[in-house]
């Protein structure tokens, strides 16, 4: 039954006269909401920047710190409160900077420490806080610590990394210490010829894991990776792979989940280990002295109670964590890419969002809201539609509305605010894709299937849908050459071909653009932070596979959010959540604000006094 009907009007108590263009400020006036004083990071929106791809200031084809500096006014115009800059430290760039060779220096193509200090100061002058990526589960194999560690078994830093002797079969064949599989494929163990032992790497062989059980090593990490930058004025860290510092010390074999594979998924043995909370308490003592916030990356942790141990205020561990329930929707069960495009249903997505939202209900914890980052493909391509320009805009606005109404600290990734989408299927996986994870997976499929054409086709389709490369292409600033990202003849990574129409400059002139809508929603979220940022989340009609309806409740007020996840018009009957005559239309993704059926990828929000229970 459409919401223009008598039945629907009775169910929702929505005045039929509310069909005019949405007034983004009306909620603050009509709902008489308040904004309670809280730590700055709880109400914040954080804008994530991938330095290599954001803006090139010197024409070498690679983004840099001065490029970020040049666009601070644009970032300020979005209405965000902080920026999170992905690793800008010195690095061989095997894993795009997540392999750090010197925490106290900047990767030369990005700039210098002095450039970083200027960027921090300029951001602060605009009221923008600065977060850096803290990557301390591992270093690069080029880091001086590892170079010393591998030089001999007697070196004082030998125990700063995790070394183990080989195992040998009856016939004398050398084997690694266990069967754990790396996050990027293959064994987690790499043989060192010089010292005749294996070292552990949960990611690339060029990213050896630090031994957090060594106290001297830990304190060197705190000084070099944390205090060095906190002393230069940063406001906090996004903490990479924060739950991997403490491993099961027995290094037993992982359960065999796939008998056809030599190496097995072992996250249960290297995540959330026995000393994790001891280590984080040490870190927190330092961070607290600087009044710095933290957001931890917490993969492979579906257990709510384990997550709460990290983010409960009384535990004094982390300010918040990224849970991966939402962004993992549609992934393969064992291997991320062992799936097919759009392998998900709306009820499954609803469940994932519900789990992350309800983390803070009845607890002293805090959560995050996000659908994109440097490790995820574009949300419109995954959860909306990029089939046409019209559908891209509609679904981009719908997802923006949804995210802006979710509780927790909101994170927006560069390009998300203009509705950037995945690179097209015409891109060559072996040429245009640059990410180590993409390349490793494709080569794994080719080797396993002996180059089977259909298997390669399936792998390419999966990468086109889920690869990290889609987040790492250059930012689309204008319709100029290379999307205005660089004046170089060729950028470090190919620009997506749709930049002529999909870019910042074009959208800044268009009041109906995805960019304009994101700006409006972020202001709306700020004005109504108690309800939209801190309100309790209630899921309605879980089984509906086309429409997502949820309610936010705070202090006797409710917001009802309805989202059409299809390109079709859908009749919609809202649940009765408001007192009679109390509901008012807050916002719609369609400018005309019409009532009636939910149109293609439409999102609407109503607000009012909650119905007495």
Language model: regions and residue ranges:
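Active-site and adjacent substrate-binding regions of carbohydrate-active enzymes
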Residues: 2-613
């Amino acid at each position: 039954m459409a919401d223009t009907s008598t039945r629907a009007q009775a169910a929702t108590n929505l005045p039929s006269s509310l069909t005019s263009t949405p007034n983004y400020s009306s909620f603050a006036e009509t709902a008489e909401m308040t904004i309670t004083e809280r730590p700055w990071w709880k109400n914040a929106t954080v804008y994530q920047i991938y330095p290599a791809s954001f803006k090139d200031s010197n024409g070498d084809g690679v983004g840099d710190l001065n490029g970020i500096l040049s666009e601070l006014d644009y970032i300020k115009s979005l209405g965000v409160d902080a920026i999170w800059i992905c690793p800008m430290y010195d690095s061989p760039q095997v894993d795009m900077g997540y392999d750090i060779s010197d925490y106290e220096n900047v990767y030369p193509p990005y700039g210098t420490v002095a450039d970083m200090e200027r960027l921090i100061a300029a951001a602060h002058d605009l009221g923008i806080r600065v977060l850096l990526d803290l990557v301390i589960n591992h270093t690069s194999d080029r880091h001086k610590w590892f170079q010393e560690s591998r030089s001999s078994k007697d070196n004082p830093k030998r125990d700063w990394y995790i070394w183990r002797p080989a195992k040998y079969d009856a016939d004398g064949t050398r084997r690694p210490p266990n069967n754990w599989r790396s996050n990027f494929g293959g064994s987690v163990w790499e043989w060192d010829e010089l010292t005749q032992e294996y070292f552990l790497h949960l990611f690339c062989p060029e990213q050896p894991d630090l031994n957090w059980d060594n106290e001297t090593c830990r304190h060197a990490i705190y000084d070099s990776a944390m205090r060095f930058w906190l002393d230069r004025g940063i406001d906090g860290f996004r903490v990479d792979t924060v739950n991997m510092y403490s491993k099961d010390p027995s290094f037993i074999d992982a359960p065999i989940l796939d008998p056809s594979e030599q190496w097995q998924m072992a996250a249960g043995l290297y995540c959330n280990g026995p000393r994790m909370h001891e280590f984080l308490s040490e870190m927190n003592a330092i961070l607290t002295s600087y009044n710095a916030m933290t957001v931890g990356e917490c993969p492979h942790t579906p257990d709510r109670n384990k997550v709460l141990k990290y983010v409960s205020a009384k535990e004094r561990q982390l300010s918040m964590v990224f849970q991966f329930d939402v962004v993992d929707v549609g992934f393969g069960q064992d291997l991320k890419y062992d799936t097919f495009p759009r392998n998900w249903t709306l009820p499954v997505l609803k469940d994932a969002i519900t789990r992350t939202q309800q983390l803070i209900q009845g607890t002293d914890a805090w959560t995050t809201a996000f659908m994109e980052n440097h490790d995820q493909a574009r949300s419109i391509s995954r959860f909306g539609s990029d089939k046409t320009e019209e559908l891209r805009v509609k679904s981009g606005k719908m997802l923006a509305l949804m995210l802006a109404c979710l509780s927790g600290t909101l994170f927006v990734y560069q390009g998300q605010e203009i509705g950037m989408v995945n690179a097209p299927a015409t891109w060559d996986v072996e040429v245009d894709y640059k990410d180590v994870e993409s390349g490793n997976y494709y080569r794994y499929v080719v080797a396993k299937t002996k180059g089977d054409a259909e298997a390669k086709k399936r792998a390419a389709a999966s990468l086109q849908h889920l690869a990290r490369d889609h987040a790492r292409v250059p930012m689309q600033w204008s319709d100029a050459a290379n999307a205005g990202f660089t004046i170089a003849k060729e950028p470090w990574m190919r620009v997506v071909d749709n930049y002529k129409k999909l870019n910042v400059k074009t959208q800044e002139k268009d009041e109906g653009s995805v960019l304009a809508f994101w700006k409006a929603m972020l202001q709306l979220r700020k004005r109504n932070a108690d309800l939209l940022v801190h309100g309790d989340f209630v899921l309605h009609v879980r089984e509906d596979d086309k429409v997502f309806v949820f309610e936010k409740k705070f202090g006797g007020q409710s917001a009802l959010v309805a989202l059409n996840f299809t390109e079709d018009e859908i009749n919609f009957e809202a649940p009765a959540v408001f007192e009679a005559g109390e509901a008012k239309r807050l916002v719609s993704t369609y400018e005309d604000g019409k009532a009636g059926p939910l149109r293609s990828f439409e999102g609407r929000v109503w607000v009012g006094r909650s119905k007495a229970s």
